[in-house]
Swiss-Prot record:
One annotated GO biological process: queuosine biosynthetic process
Cofactor binding note of this UniProt entry: Binds 1 zinc ion per subunit.
Function statement: Catalyzes the ATP-dependent conversion of 7-carboxy-7-deazaguanine (CDG) to 7-cyano-7-deazaguanine (preQ(0)).
Reaction equation(s) it catalyzes: 7-carboxy-7-deazaguanine + NH4(+) + ATP = 7-cyano-7-deazaguanine + ADP + phosphate + H2O + H(+)
Cofactor(s) needed by this chain: Zn(2+)
PANTHER family according to UniProt: 7-CYANO-7-DEAZAGUANINE SYNTHASE
Protein's name in the database: 7-cyano-7-deazaguanine synthase
Native source species: Synechococcus elongatus (strain ATCC 33912 / PCC 7942 / FACHB-805)
Length: 231
């Protein structure tokens, strides 16, 4: 069976991408990172998701890119966005170079494990301000993969697959349900804690999609109340 490395953060998008890789016939190898994020709740979710999907190989890598700051996801002194992302602006939750570092390490793992694909949960719709979630970024990295590795120069570079890149969050929820993703086990909240906050921008986008898709029971109580107040 062909292998695929899946970048698994523990969030809904990465979990759905992992499930898609399995549905596409790959043996999935999960890769998660301790990069200095505010909390480890998402890594606990990654473990749970990997187990639920039957992923046997799961690598955790320490790469503390948070130590030089630059993001509200890694710097507790910076407030988390909670009122929506301004169109055309890069959100404060962008972590400088994060996807570039992660995908580079995924390429290393894929080559070592002879994996023919790398599945990414990146999305260019809900977070269109992120420069490293765009199709042209992905295409450029694919070219780099072909030039920077032994398998690449031999014409067998792993294919970067981003099945959700053009999906709206509600479409991702629907796909996740079809693929059997354990949605309640995933974690998208920017804050840590026993339960998702329901206030940060990530929670709001997720809650709105869950409710629109017909699964309000998986949304936060705050998210359900906010939707009920809308005209």
């Amino acid at each position: 069976m062909a292998k695929a490395v899946v970048l698994l953060s523990g969030g809904l998008d990465s979990a759905t991408a992992a499930a898609q890789a399995i549905a596409d016939g790959y043996e999935a190898i999960a890769l998660s990172f301790r990069y200095g994020q505010r909390h480890v709740r998402e890594l606990e979710a990654a473990r749970s998701v990997a187990a639920a999907l039957g992923i046997n190989q799961h690598f955790f890598v320490d790469v503390n890119i948070a130590q030089w700051g630059g993001s509200s996801l890694t710097d507790a002194a910076e407030p988390l966005p909670g009122s929506g992302v301004v169109a055309g602006e890069i959100p404060s939750t962008y972590v400088p170079g994060r996807n570039t570092v992660f995908i580079a390490l995924a390429l290393s793992l894929a080559e070592a494990q002879q994996a023919s694909a790398i599945y990414l949960g990146i999305n260019a719709v809900d977070y269109s301000g992120y420069p490293d979630c765009r199709p042209d970024y992905l295409a450029a990295f694919q070219q780099l993969a072909s030039l920077s590795s032994k398998v690449g120069v031999e014409g067998q570079a792993p294919q970067l697959v981003a099945p959700l890149i053009h999906d709206h969050k509600v479409d991702i929820v629907r796909r996740a349900v079809v693929l059997g993703v354990p949605i309640p086990a995933t974690w998208s909240c920017y804050a840590g804690g026993a339960e998702a906050c329901g206030r940060c921008d990530s929670c709001r986008i997720r809650d709105r999609a869950l409710i629109e898709a017909g699964y309000p029971e998986w949304a936060t109580a705050i998210g359900r109340s906010l939707v009920s107040l809308q005209p």
